[in-house]
Amino acid sequence: MDGDCSSLLPAVCLVLADPKQTPPDDTSLEKLLDWFKDLHSQSNGQVLLEHQPCLLEFISSVCASKATDPAILSFTLKLTGLLAASKQDFHLLEEGGHLVCVFEREAWSVCDLWEDASVRSGWIQGLLNMLKHQQALDFICRQGLIKVILQLQNDRSLFVACLANQLLVQILKLLTPSDVTSGSDAVVSSKSSSSLDWVSVSSEITNAVVEALSSENHPQVLQGVQLLSLVLSQCEEPIRSSLWKDVLPPLEVLINRGSEPLTQPLMTVLRAAVMTPLLGQSEYKVEEFLEVMLGTGNRKEGILCATLIVKLEKCPKVLKRKAMDIILLPLQCVSTQSQDEKEVDLVLKEPLSQKALCISLLVQSLSSLAELAHKEYFEGVCIPSVTSRVVQLLRVCSGHCTSSLLHVSACTHLIGSCKIQRCGLDTLGALSVYEDNLDLRKDIFGVLLDYLKSPDSHATVLKKTFQAVLRWIGVCASFPDLLQFISNDLFPVLEKRMCDVRWEVRDSTLEFITQLTVALSDNSGFVEVLYTSGLVSILLSLLSDTEGYVRASAVTAVGEAVTSSVQQMALVSKINLLEEALAQMMIILSQDTEGFPRRAVVKTFTSWLKGSNPITALDSSLSSVLSLGGNDFDWEVKMHTLELAEALMEKMLTCCPYAVQSFSSSERTRLTQSLSKLKDLGLFDVLLNGLFDCDRPVCEKSCQLLLKLKRLNAEKADFDHDALVLKACGNRWGDEVQSRFLNKQQVKASEHVLIGGGEGTEKDLHCIKEIPLSVILQILDLDDMQRMLKLSSDHVVNSPRSLMEDILSAAQQSEENIVDCY
């Protein structure tokens, strides 16, 4: 604790303990607690209460007062527990009787303070904070606080009840294996009285869980189930198996009862159980419970349970197969022909006849299939059959429903259902990982093309369709008929979608074209098809779209089109594309009123610059891009401009890495030429302007790049520094640098006079019009600036000292207001 905080703390404690004072807001109290947590973690064995006795006085004062505000009492409870987390401070608090005083619930009940939920939650959090060692657990046992905690487990405040569960789990975690056996009946391994207390505690908690699970009161059952889940996931053996064995009878009753409101909580219990050694031991019935859950509750929960089972590593294959059948069942029902009626489960007939239930079941089935689309999860399943059913379902949703389908009534519910269409498309895309499906590619591309062509397709459905098409094109890239499909079928549809009246569709189409171009950039045939299709001219026209998002996506798409043509050495014949693209992008960067398109332009230039194939036509535009981007009012545009500057530095200074080293004569010449070119491009002005920008991320990035330059300009680099002279006047950074430069000159001049060197020359103190870059980098304390920039913006405002000063200031203002009233 620093000296300022140490001197302020006693006064703060007096203010907080004074019931006449209005307590600080909850946020301030929580920040104060966070500070104490930091002190505790950095204590290095020091006893905080010995150095700050005012804390003991504060705790005593709050305990003695009958008019304490609930917020202050809650704070005191948490603080006491936090202090008691240290063994030394725990002994001091216990010897002084403070622990009993603070955590004695009866005292707060008399004052009706216990009725406030914040006091009850503070009481639990205080115990949670303290429960870091066995002495704390021993204190809880001796004081009989377990009963209170178990009562709070059923508190009317859900927050308090959840905290009580967490506290009970923490208590069980502190019961070491030497204290409790793995059997149902605990056996004491030590004859100490404290061990006896701990064993009785574990039995008391176990009995409470059994009682809760056996209760007819739903909230009580729910809390018992939640505690069981926490114990299974957080506690070790033998506590875990001991508790499971005791709760097995009531848990079995609950699972067999099939209560729908409890299906999800019970699934959480089983999900935790399967992650433990309980799975695979028949006496614990975990697998048996999973099988029961497959057939109980609603079908949606059954599919969730089935998904969990399929993903289990240690699970009987028979159970996994049954689970997979349950997942596939809804899909199988709606896509089965009437002559195959025997194949389907007629239990689903009623749910499928109701629109809401039908859609819900299919969504869950499809989502599970998409999640499980990995080879090890689909063992023994005919993948092409599943894929065909998904294709059939997507056709039904788009209105192609044949009378031969078994559940024609269910099919009518699905026509135009965006939920089913989106889930079906996700599933179809996920199934692309299976080579067995490649023979179905014509059917798959056929249904996807139908969705792209359909005027009824929702914008979100089209986006999902594009994603699925991209995945299937990725796995079918080696097939010779793919380019024919793209040229004859896909591109004509894309042309129409690029002119769609809905801007979301135009945007999604452009994103798809960008991704497709990246995916097939190595395919010379695709690049040729792209340029002969007429899509490129539409891309260029969309650079002036009315919607900013679309313009931004068009910029990215054009950028990738140029990149792909350069990679295939096709730009020579398409030089007009680059010229027109550059012209329109410069207009966007200089005139567009929305930030997204301007950001996209700078990012595209950076992408071009980083490309493996140089685009010499960019050189004439780089200076303008740096100037416009560096002076943009959008901070993200400035950040992207700095990334462009970094790419330029990397590209032009590759022969001279950012490290202090000795250079040969030819290397020095190349370095000087490269730095001179960067200066001519205005890169140094961008970095220096960014250093004094109002947006901190921009300052940080500029500082980082200038530090690289500073290391490069170190004395050992030994090149002509005078060749890099920057104009200080007329630049935003000039005033700041000149001010620092002249201050240093004045200091030197005054020192010169003091040692008798004559009068300082007045001309040295005049406004400097030009300053060498090396001098600028020396003037600026970049290391210190970087350190300050890395601090959070609120490191001063939210410091402990500032917080305590605010508390004292508010208290003083309150007293002055009282005096004014008189």
From Swiss-Prot:
Listed A to Z, the keywords are: Cytoplasm, DNA damage, Metal-binding, Nucleus, Repeat, Zinc
Q: Which GO terms describe its cellular component?
A: cytoplasm; nucleus
An example GO BP is: response to ionizing radiation
Q: What is its main location?
A: nucleus
Subcellular location(s) per record: Nucleus; Cytoplasm
Q: Which SUPFAM superfamilies match?
A: ARM repeat
- Tell me the residue numbers annotated for binding Zn(2+): 821
Which regions does the record annotate with the repeat HEAT? 490-528, 535-573
Give yes or no: UniProt keyword RNA-binding. no
What does the record say about domains? The BRAT1-like motif mediates inhibition of the endonuclease activity of INTS11 by forming hyrogen bond and hydrophobic interactions with the active site of INTS11: Cys-821 coordinates one of the two active site zinc ions of INTS11.
Q: This protein is called what?
A: Integrator complex assembly factor BRAT1
User: Gene behind this chain?
Assistant: brat1
